[in-house]
Amino acid sequence: MSKVLSSLPVGERVGIAFSGGLDTSCAVAWMREKGAVPCAYTADIGQYDEPNIEEVPGRATEYGAEIARLVDAKRALVEEGLIALQCGAFHIRSGGKTYFNTTPLGRAVTGVMLVRAMRDDDVEIWGDGSTYKGNDIERFYRYGLIANPRLRIYKPWLDTAFVEELGGRTEISEWLVARGFPYRDATEKAYSTDANIWGATHEAKRLEELDAGLDIVEPIMGVAAWREDIEVAPETVSVSFEYGRPVALNGIEFADPVALVPEANAIGGRHGLGASDQIENRIIEAKSRGIYEAPGMALLHIAYERLLNAIHNEDTVANYHTEGRRLGRLMYEGRWLDPQSLMLRESLQRWVGSAITGEVTLRLRRGDDYTILDTTGPALSYHPDKLSMERVGNAAFGPADRIGQLTMRNLDIADSRSRLEQYAATGLIGGPTAELVGELQEGSARSILELDVSPEDDALSREIDASSEGAAFDAGTD
């Protein structure tokens, strides 16, 4: 049975995620006029594009909302963001730049917390401003039903009656003015912006064209580092982690992470850190383009991964990147609270994040230009003396040990050479690769395993092998 209503449920309470913008303001007024009972819910997620968030519910009341509530979701969003940081749940990367999934994070928290607030008011029909072509319509659908299985969905922008009457911004503004509603004639930008405490997304309109660059965007979380007329002074910054969580910036400890994140944003924002231009695959597999800001997350991410590489072994780091990317895509699809995500989250937090304790000192310059000055911690696996090119006492291993290790490699090198000979014989290897490797005569790989030894040494080796095999057989360890 479909949970989506195609027409306005007259006489019933309809909750709407209210931003205070033109579209949702008009939706509230239109639903009231047509006989529904609109109830407005606004999430305080620390959005940088709405500094007066506490005033937004009052606007909803002016447009006819019976209930208008502000739901403080900052703490929940910060906590989910720290989990994403620990897990490396970021799958969109290109050209050395990362999108930190700040909008999908916000949707997970907003979707669940607003629907829970609605349920407290016996509101079980929910609408929001997402369009049918985007990701948010599915994200909110999933999170809404997870929070309230009885939920039904009504979106004015999927209602033919609403769209035919109020199909564009001109029609909406005229409709509001004709009925005497307050109308904030916001300056029309060349793109749309959505933000929360972790980051900002700029997309649509002019940014849909790939000949429009990052430089048409006016950042809201920091400086436009790409502008030559803006001075950016170098700055030395330290970031401290305990058990995978950031706890201090520049030596100042933060007991409350909700206070730490804005400070990280301010530091990174002074340099334009963490801005990226990405082409991505939406949930429906259509390509879209976005310009993203996340100065604080970028700063924390740099320090976190520096410690990660200094602490964990190669396979653990590889699992972090592989599973983190999988988790990032699941979050992007609105599956952050699904079992497969919880499984990955728990594993990465427990076995990767819990070991990340230490401090990283950086020199920030302009944009993503930075230098790591120092890395310290109580449990680093990095020890210079292990691989020092200088003479050291009590070395972990010596030349003879390495000769033995290299000799053991002969087994798999011979196998690899045999495969190359096989491929060459069937014509699979040609062109530049064949020119690089040279002649691949079949059977020559055996020479890798053959040793040039005297008959006496060969006889001794055979005696040792025979004795070893006999001892192993007698001990039951063969």
UniProtKB/Swiss-Prot annotation:
| Gene Ontology biological process | argininosuccinate metabolic process; L-arginine biosynthetic process; urea cycle
Q: What class of enzyme is it?
A: ligase
Q: Where in the cell is it found?
A: Cytoplasm
**Which residues are involved in binding L-aspartate?**
131, 135-136
Listed binding positions for ATP are 17-25, 43, 129, 131, 136, 194
Under the heading Pfam families, the entry gives:
Arginosuc_syn_C, Arginosuc_synth
Give the reactions, separated by semicolons, that this protein catalyses.
Answer: L-citrulline + L-aspartate + ATP = 2-(N(omega)-L-arginino)succinate + AMP + diphosphate + H(+)
Any one GO cellular component localisation term in the record:
cytoplasm
Disulphide bridges, residue numbers? none
Q: In which pathway does it act?
A: Amino-acid biosynthesis; L-arginine biosynthesis; L-arginine from L-ornithine and carbamoyl phosphate: step 2/3
For this protein, the record's PANTHER family field holds: ARGININOSUCCINATE SYNTHASE
Family affiliation: Belongs to the argininosuccinate synthase family. Type 2 subfamily.
State the HAMAP family in the record: Arg_succ_synth_type2 (MF_00581)
**The protein's name:** Argininosuccinate synthase
Gene, per the UniProt record: argG
